[in-house]
Amino acid sequence: MSEHVYNLVKKHHSVRKFKNKPLSEDVVKKLVEAGQSASTSSFLQAYSIIGIDDEKIKENLREVSGQPYVVENGYLFVFVIDYYRHHLVDQHAETDMENAYGSTEGLLVGAIDAALVAENIAVTAEDMGYGIVFLGSLRNDVERVREILDLPDYVFPVFGMAVGEPADDENGAAKPRLPFDHVFHHNKYHADKETQYAQMADYDQTISEYYDQRTNGNRKETWSQQIEMFLGNKARLDMLEQLQKSGLIQR
């Protein structure tokens, strides 16, 4: 049995430095088609992909994200939850489907659809020799992103993805993930606190050593410290408001 795909995904790491070489239209089309082949709940296909090569639009999105590689890449994708076409079906059929796509379940379906599509694109791009980085930073200002991209009601930007040929001096590497036993629960969830704390202590040591080696001693924080810093940062607290402004989560 070939382990090509297994080895490919195990090597994944975010690439944040790209060569100044735009992706061809053919490559973009192949990536999108690969994304479309992802599983989709009840065949709703509740997503859309916005491809961006306009430098002014990229720059506007960079101002939202604060990250240079939103501009400096081979191509930029933005993935959105999309119930606009479903809304049009609803209007044409004169039914009341908004109870479904304006629900919390509808939000989950759209977000999962978009994520599955994006992961297909990521794996396909890496198989072609490109690097990718996901961009949750576009949610820093959802209202501005909706304005920049002319998003109608029932469409919500969830994340972006920069794709391109890695720069010659790009030196990223796969970070050690939580060990198998930490994330795989057999038959039922195992919530024993002592076990969980022991596992996290081991993983904290692994991550601290990883950063120490990667930075020649300049960085040594643990995974737990990163979590405390990230989740303790009161950011993007307007998500519910922005979702509701988009016509989602009405009930």
From Swiss-Prot:
Similarity comment: family membership: Belongs to the flavin oxidoreductase frp family.
Cofactor(s) recorded in Swiss-Prot or TrEMBL: FMN
CDD domains: NfsA-like
E.C. code: 1.6.-.-
Keyword set, alphabetical order: Flavoprotein, FMN, NADP, Oxidoreductase
Gene (name only): nfrA
Origin organism lineage: Bacteria, Bacillati, Bacillota, Bacilli, Bacillales
InterPro entries, per database record: Flavin_OxRdtase_Frp (IPR016446), Nitroreductase (IPR029479), Nitroreductase-like (IPR000415)
Protein name per its UniProtKB record: NADPH-dependent oxidoreductase
Listed NCBIfam families: PRK10765.1
The protein's role, per its UniProt record: Reduces FMN, organic nitro compounds and disulfide DTNB. Involved in maintenance of the cellular redox state and the disulfide stress response.
Entry's induction text: By ethanol stress and disulfide stress.
Gene Ontology MF, one: oxidoreductase activity
